[in-house]
């Protein structure tokens, strides 16, 4: 969890589904199932960003992370989206890691910006 690669999109820190699954020690397919089962609770732009087409090509071109050429849709999760995943998994590990994500991943950028 301490070695998460930092990913930013439009100036906000985000995580990929795989990063969340790895950090929460969960199966990425389970995260996907939970998301699809509760999709009406997730708000695009607030909980996640879905990149496709030109947006995905532009994101790939920036080279922040390797995105397979076979991927035609990439979900990036915000702090609030990571919270919903922790809630749906409801494991001790997910809650523990979520707290660390807030303190050490999502909040770091806002702390740096407020000191400028």
Where are these regions (language model features)?
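An anion-engaging/catalytic patch
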Residues: 1-116
């Amino acid at each position: 969890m301490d070695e998460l690669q930092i990913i930013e999109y439009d100036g906000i820190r985000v995580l990929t589904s795989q990063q969340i699954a790895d950090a929460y020690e969960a199966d990425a397919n389970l995260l996907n199932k939970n998301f699809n089962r509760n999709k009406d609770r997730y708000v695009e732009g607030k909980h996640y960003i879905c990149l496709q087409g030109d947006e995905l090509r532009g994101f790939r071109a920036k080279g922040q992370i390797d995105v397979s050429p076979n991927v035609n849709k990439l979900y990036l999760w915000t702090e609030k989206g990571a919270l919903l995943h922790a809630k749906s998994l409801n494991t001790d590990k997910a809650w523990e890691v979520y707290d660390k994500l807030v303190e050490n991943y999502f909040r770091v950028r806002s702390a740096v910006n407020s000191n400028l």
